[in-house]
Amino acid sequence: MSSYTLGIDTSNYATSLAVFDTAGEVVCAKKRFLPVKEGQLGLRQSDALFHHTVALPEMLAELGSEFDLTQISAVGVSEKPRPVKGSYMPCFLAGVSAAEAFALARGIPLIRTTHQQGHAAAALFAAKGEEFFREKTLLFHISGGTTDLLLCDEVKHIETLGTSSDLYAGQAVDRVGVKLGFGFPAGVEVSRLAAECDETIKPKSSVRGMECSLSGLENQCNALLTAGKSPAYVCKYCLLCVADTVVKMTKAAQKEYPGLAVVCAGGVMSSDIIRSWVQQRLPQVYFVPGQYSSDNAIGVSILAAREAGLWLK
């Protein structure tokens, strides 16, 4: 008999809810991006916390109109960005508050996890169902706040193998997009415009082993615009530089951890241009659908099911 779990994630980008059926199906998933004023690169934490506080009751009401929330057997929530000591962002307090209230009112277990583990769980589930929850995998998590190459052991233990020494890939993409007049986050619009460029581009990336530097990418893109290159060209160049970085870091990881599956997740990895470039060079790498790749609560709901003993017993 199926059981159902609720996942809640309140990142600095979006408010997300999801319901997971322990038969192995995502019943529903909802996401609302936080409003960012034109020309700005994100929100202050106090503003993000406010918007989550407003959005959560509305979104839970919407969810309740589509699914009987009295059937929920456990609730999961991301309480901080990463499963490491000192990791903290106030925006996650909104989700924790809502999850605690829901669990207490229903008398059901509350499972605390992290935003990064939620991303990992959603991506691994989308790539190969429960199989990747039983083994070690390499996960590339690239978003506005991460450019991390991770070693995942059943998502219970996550080790960072490599990262950016400065700017994150999502930050570089967003800064290029906002400079071109797009709203924040700008990844979707940057990818759309990049697809209009038919020119062959040779990207430049700065990678040493499993570590990278992306601060130069923003400067390169600004220089290209100043030199008269079209916005479409610059957007494509930016995305291909990220893709080339992924390829080089992945190859370095595969030398050290041969035989492990590689899964790509995070909002930046939703780009068709990045996916195409990477898979032409590393065809065995898994990319997952957008709703499992960008910010979501799907992974949190899945982890709630596992940790509550309702799934993968």
What are these language model-derived features?
Residues 1-2, 108, 112-137, 302-303:
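Conserved phosphate-binding catalytic cores of ATP/NTP-utilizing and phosphoryl-transfer enzymes
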Residues 3, 10-11, 18, 27-29, ...:
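A short helix-loop
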Residues 11-50, 157-160:
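Short glycine-rich, Thr/Ser-proximal phosphate-binding strand/loop in the N-terminal lobe
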Residues 30-32, 51-66, 245-250:
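Short, well-ordered amphipathic alpha-helical segments that serve as non-catalytic structural scaffolds
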Residues 61-97:
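Short beta-strand-loop/turn "lid" adjacent to the catalytic site in phosphate-handling enzymes
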Residues 77-80, 143-145, 263-271:
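Glycine-rich beta-strand-to-loop/alpha-helix junction loops that act as flexible
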Residues 119-123, 288-313:
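Glycine-rich phosphate-binding/hydrolytic loop that grips phosphoryl groups
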Residues 191-262, 268-286, 305-313:
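A contiguous, well-structured pocket-lining segment that forms one wall/lid of small-molecule binding clefts
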